[in-house]
Swiss-Prot record:
Function: Mitochondrial intermembrane chaperone that participates in the import and insertion of multi-pass transmembrane proteins into the mitochondrial inner membrane. Also required for the transfer of beta-barrel precursors from the TOM complex to the sorting and assembly machinery (SAM complex) of the outer membrane. Acts as a chaperone-like protein that protects the hydrophobic precursors from aggregation and guide them through the mitochondrial intermembrane space.
One annotated GO molecular function: metal ion binding
Protein name: Mitochondrial import inner membrane translocase subunit tim9
A GO-annotated cellular component: mitochondrial inner membrane
Keyword annotations from UniProtKB, A to Z: Chaperone, Disulfide bond, Membrane, Metal-binding, Mitochondrion, Mitochondrion inner membrane, Protein transport, Translocation, Transport, Zinc
Record flagged with keyword S-adenosyl-L-methionine: no
Cellular localization per UniProt: Mitochondrion inner membrane
Pfam families for this protein: zf-Tim10_DDP
Membrane topology per record: Peripheral membrane protein
Alphabetized InterPro entries for the sequence: Mito_inner_translocase_sub (IPR050673), Tim10-like (IPR004217), Tim10-like_dom_sf (IPR035427)
Record's keyword annotation contains Acetylation: no
Motif (Twin CX3C motif): 35-59
Superkingdom per UniProt: Eukaryota
């Protein structure tokens, strides 16, 4: 990183990694909460029913597809903004 000492750069990297872990845990927690709430409604058994299991699989797949698309779109927007700034 420009203008940073090696120690400052390491500290910044550690902070960024910590933030990324927190963000991942937040997204994961929301995924679990959303899919559990949407799919699990029978608490008479420890095991998931076939319907609940299928619902959770579809919910997780849909959420992951959405996250992937959002990441792609943010990348596209970032590339466009970077190109625009370089033209100026």
């Amino acid at each position: 990183m420009d203008g940073l000492t090696a120690a400052e750069s390491r500290e910044l990297d550690q902070r960024l990694q910590k933030r990324q872990v927190k963000e991942f845990m937040s997204v994961f927690g929301n995924l679990v909460d959303n899919c559990f709430t949407a799919c699990v409604d029978d608490f008479t058994s420890k095991a998931l029913s076939g319907r609940e299991s299928g619902c959770i699989s579809r919910c997780v797949l849909k959420s992951m597809s959405t996250q992937t698309r959002l990441g792609e779109r943010f990348g596209e927007l970032n590339a466009a903004m970077t190109a625009e700034m370089q033209r100026r």
